[in-house]
Amino acid sequence: MHKASSLSELGFDAGGASSGFFRPVADGCPATPTSSAVPHRRLTKISVIGAGNVGMAIAQTILTQNLADEIALVDALPDKLRGEALDLQHAAAFLPRVRISGTDAAVTKNSDLVIVTAGARQIPGETRLNLLQRNVALYRKIVPPVAEHSPDALLLVVSNPVDVLTYVAWKLSGFPASRVIGSGTNLDSSRFRFLIAEHLDVNAQDVQAYMVGEHGDSSVAIWSSISVGGMPAFKSLRDSHRSFDEAALEGIRRAVVGGAYEVIGLKGYTSWAIGYSVASLAASLLRDQRRVHPVSVLASGFHGISDGHEVFLSLPARLGRGGILGVAEMDLTEAEAAQLRRSAKTLWENCQLLDL
């Protein structure tokens, strides 16, 4: 007797099943075939724009996880760039075979994924708007040449403020929204999972929990999303721990948001966690893993956000070789949805101040 090996063999129409969970972003591209449909492996090239602490942590993590056959590094400081490239090249005997190059934007030609970490540093006393405008000026120099050299690439923005700069990169690149992604709250969600895992004494990989919205002070913790080992956990946590009141929950959310500030206060900058976070996104994208990550996407039309507001913020999205393959339809409380809409309104207002 033949045993069914898939839902379709059991009579389910599995072809469109994902549409019940995910919706495409506006201005998106159709999904690419799964990697199993590609007959021969092609070489993979990743470019990292910005060779600072974050950029080099990302490059190092990509190397050790064997995610690319070639890495191109670009930075405004040529001596530092050459030093960083040489330092990695000297480790060739201990790493998978990879070609490392680095000068200007021309070395990014034919990239599969371009990761932008470059950003202007805030001057003491400088307003947030002025800093944002200087970052836009920097992106005008970075993004159009990158888009010209790699017109089919995926663009992953890591620079802060990541949600607004992802919007800027989308506008300047001319790419469809499905191919422009911000690192968003992927790392915030990892910190959220870590805190819950520490409390329950379980492995963080067995915890599922999302932070969504703006990557910043107004990020939204989706408490109902918490599961441990696939089992919903928030209700049992509240039932067994009376201390899990609204004030305590807000304290946990603030601890997640403040995690980066704590690290910066202790060592001066963040690097390793964001390196692993971005590498996980690169793997999901380039290996067509179709994993769900909370990343900054074009959120128009989701959860009551106006269709007319072109704003990027983090929502759980399915990632694959085509970029954003769909955004999960979360079941939010009205309070959570209202917080998300407030974040969207603030981000939209910031975007309107830019000359794009």
UniProtKB/Swiss-Prot annotation:
Residues given in the record as substrate binding sites: R128, N160, R191, T270
Pfam families, A to Z: Ldh_1_C, Ldh_1_N
Top EC category: oxidoreductase
Claim: Transit peptide is one of the keywords in the record: no
Catalyzed reactions per annotation: (S)-lactate + NAD(+) = pyruvate + NADH + H(+)
Keyword DNA-binding part of the UniProt annotation: no
Disulfide-linked positions: none
Keyword terms of this UniProt record: NAD, Oxidoreductase, Stress response
Pathway: Fermentation; pyruvate fermentation to lactate; (S)-lactate from pyruvate: step 1/1
GO cellular component, one term: cytoplasm
InterPro entries: L-lactate/malate_DH (IPR001557), L-lactate_DH (IPR011304), L-lactate_DH_AS (IPR018177), Lactate/malate_DH_C (IPR022383), Lactate/malate_DH_N (IPR001236), Lactate_DH/Glyco_Ohase_4_C (IPR015955), NAD(P)-bd_dom_sf (IPR036291)
Induction comment from the UniProt entry of this chain: By hypoxia.
Biological processes per GO annotation: lactate metabolic process
GO molecular function: L-lactate dehydrogenase activity
Assembly notes: Tetramer that arise from random association of LDH-A and LDH-B.
The protein, known as: L-lactate dehydrogenase A
Annotated source species: Hordeum vulgare
